[in-house]
């Protein structure tokens, strides 16, 4: 009798343990479902903001810039006004990305440009890099690709703000030197295109030539994403599986004059500065670990 009662007690205890044990498959499915829902929601938000950006660009080209030009005839004053407007719009746009939980953003060191007439250079991993910088650099002048000047959604803002257009290498250097001499702060991506999927930053020498010939202060900025977002070959409508953390950091300013030592030529100094920047980005752009958080 005692043996029978003991066996029954053991069965009851085993049954309780089986009920208490977690169900890993079910939990994994719920986590996967939650992650999928989060990605779908962020993809919808991403498409929505693309539509908003397109509408804003169309309004800038067809309404804002033409009307503003009627009331502000002076070209310099008009450009400053449009650039201030761009500053507030890009801040609002990036703020909307944060509110919609498309990105987590950490910014440091780029809101205090060393002096007027400086050159800000940054790596270019994503389509939103220019927005990230323009939203933190008041009156910044972007060096834009020529294709954006004829794009119906961007030409109004580029022409109204009098941004520099990268058409011809020599004329670009001359134009940038003139802008820097006039006290404008330029924002330039030395890669001239978004970073390739292998993550290697391949710099061209244009930025170095501008800095060396202008003898202007150069502020290097690093832009890092924990997850690929709007990269060179990604689908614009599909958000990453995990919400990206974005880190934008301004580093110690560089004096281009130090690369002109030993009476070297401007071309040699530009090569030295380009190599210095290449090593700088190779060292600073380590793999960014995403923060620990729950499903998104």
Residue ranges of model-derived segments:
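Residue-level detector of flexible, active-site-proximal loop/helix-junction positions
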Residues: 111-112, 149, 225, 254
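Membrane-anchoring hydrophobic helices of lipid-metabolizing enzymes
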Residues: 3, 8-118
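Thr-Gly-centered strand-to-loop micro-motif
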Residues: 108, 143-145, 167, 190, ...
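Short amphipathic alpha-helical segments and helix-helix/interface helices
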Residues: 94, 133, 154-155, 176, ...
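Catalytic core of membrane glycerolipid acyltransferases/transacylases, capturing the structured
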Residues: 65-88, 100, 114-168
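Non-catalytic C-terminal accessory region of glycerolipid acyltransferases
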Residues: 2-30, 170-296
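A generic structural signal for well-ordered alpha-helical segments
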Residues: 97-98, 158, 179, 211
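Short gly/ser/thr-rich secondary-structure transition/capping motifs
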Residues: 99-107, 167-170, 230-233
